[in-house]
Swiss-Prot record:
Composed of a catalytic GlpA/B dimer and of membrane bound GlpC. This is Anaerobic glycerol-3-phosphate dehydrogenase subunit B. HAMAP family: Glycerol3P_GlpB. It comes from the Bacteria. It catalyses: a quinone + sn-glycerol 3-phosphate = dihydroxyacetone phosphate + a quinol. Keywords: Flavoprotein, FMN, Oxidoreductase. It is an enzyme of class 1 (oxidoreductase). One of its GO terms (molecular function) is glycerol-3-phosphate dehydrogenase (quinone) activity. Belongs to the anaerobic G-3-P dehydrogenase subunit B family. GO terms for cellular component: glycerol-3-phosphate dehydrogenase (FAD) complex. Pathway: Polyol metabolism; glycerol degradation via glycerol kinase pathway; glycerone phosphate from sn-glycerol 3-phosphate (anaerobic route): step 1/1. It comes from Salmonella agona (strain SL483). One of its GO terms (biological process) is glycerol catabolic process.
């Protein structure tokens, strides 16, 4: 099977790269093994929250300039501040075109409220998520009886420290009792599958309506809206106060929805989606990828003009840690890592950990190297890249988006030259 591009990995980076390549008229396939890290995320995307020296970032342009000085090997630093901003804006447009109407400004970070009621600087958030400063003084944090994925009293306690009048309440929906037989099934995603049924909407409205008359804003867990935000908008139009949603413990309704919106858009535009499959081997000839062999297609290889590695980091097995070191398991690409295992980590758990910055070695076009030689038609994007700490620096989603679009533009340019 011949394709212009085969993307190995169906997470945020892989999907955005595929969508951008489709804009250039290229035929793409995505091979994906299972759920991506988006399923376990908040659904918000960070661009750059903190510099390596610990300074918080609010002005993104100034932050990117400082990052270039402090971390010259960071994926952003390789592109330059203006290029990063341009690609980030393109990514936001691409997300909106896919139905993910995310709120945010590429030039200025905003602060969203987290499930614990604290504030986190971010780039893009779902419109349901409350952002600081809140537009209300009297707030009620509402939990769902029996839901262990969200603790209303913890969020309320944090918000009270910000001089807000915050109460807590709990709603009990007997219609959810069918999920209570097994506590592990009473999770936000399963509740959403039930509440998203339009017949159940009035039940949720009836439960929230008495609470809404005594406050200016309701904050509750995101336990509905798996496909879209229609129910949230329906409730906001009818309740006498604002309704906002906080992401829960994984799996996350907002994260799954974002992934599904991108995946459906990719398929709608003619992309080939290969779920439940796994790349077992990649054949390289004369420094280029010639064939990709997957588990489900056995002896039928995929033959791409270009290939993209978007396999993720340790969480997605895009990188594997062994006693001897860190390796990239599909091709055995060169990996940037510390010389000894003892240098992988810091003693204090909450300190920035060196292993977070491990990843494949690439050139400035994000083409990785194998035994010191660049693989000419292969690009590495997203969390598999080296040189950044997505947790400490708050840049995971941004690096995925920016590197994906940079690789897509580079591939499209080269594909046009080869025609």
């Amino acid at each position: 099977m011949k394709f212009d591009t085969v993307i190995m990995g169906g997470g945020l980076a892989g999907l955005l790269c595929g969508l951008q390549l489709q804009q250039h008229g290229l035929r793409c396939a995505i091979v994906t093994r299972g759920q991506s890290a988006l399923h376990f995320s908040s659904g918000s995307l960070d661009l750059l929250s903190t510099l390596p020296d610990g300074q918080p970032v609010t002005d993104i342009t100034a932050g990117l300039d400082a990052l270039c000085r402090q971390a010259p090997e960071h994926p952003y630093s390789r592109l330059g501040a203006q290029k990063v901003l341009t690609l980030a804006q393109q990514a936001q447009t691409l997300l909106n075109a896919s139905g993910a109407q995310l709120y945010g400004d590429v030039q200025q970070a905003h602060q969203r409220v987290t499930p614990l009621g604290t504030l986190r600087s971010t780039w893009l958030s779902s419109p349901e998520v409350p952002v600081w400063p809140l537009s209300a003084q009297r707030i009620c944090v509402v939990g769902v009886s029996g839901l262990l994925d969200f603790q209303a009293h913890l969020a309320a306690a944090s918000l009270r420290q910000r001089d807000l009048n915050v109460e807590t309440a709990e709603i009990d929906l007997p219609e959810l009792d069918v999920l209570r037989d097994n506590p592990t099934e009473f999770r936000a995603v399963n509740i959403a599958r039930l509440l998203d049924n339009e017949e159940k909407w009035p039940l949720l409205y009836d439960a929230l309506s008495p609470i809404a008359t005594n406050c200016d804003m309701i904050i509750m867990p995101a336990c509905f809206g798996l496909a879209n935000d229609t129910l949230w908008r329906w409730l906001n139009e009818r309740l006498p106060c604002a309704l906002t949603l906080l992401p829960t413990l994984p799996p996350s309704v907002l994260g799954i929805r974002l992934h599904n919106q991108l995946q459906r858009q990719f398929v709608r535009q003619g992309g080939i989606w290969m779920p439940g499959d796994e790349v077992k081997k990649v054949t390289c000839r004369r420094g280029t990828v010639s064939e990709i062999w997957t588990r489900n297609h056995a002896d039928i290889p995929l033959r791409p003009r270009f290939a993209v590695l978007a396999s993720g980091s340790f969480f997605s097995s895009g990188l594997v840690a062994e006693r001897e070191g860190i390796r990239e398991p599909i091709l055995g690409l060169d990996v940037q890592q510390t010389a000894t295992r003892a240098e992988w980590y810091q003693q204090h758990f909450f300190d920035p950990q060196p292993w977070q910055q491990f990843g494949v070695v690439t050139d400035d076009a994000f083409r990785p190297s194998l035994a010191g030689n660049t693989v000419e038609n292969l690009y590495a994007i997203g969390s598999v890249l080296a040189g950044f700490d997505p947790i400490a620096e708050g840049c995971g989603g941004g690096v995925c988006a920016v590197s994906a679009l940079q690789a897509a533009h580079h591939i499209a340019e080269r594909a046009g030259e080869q025609q």
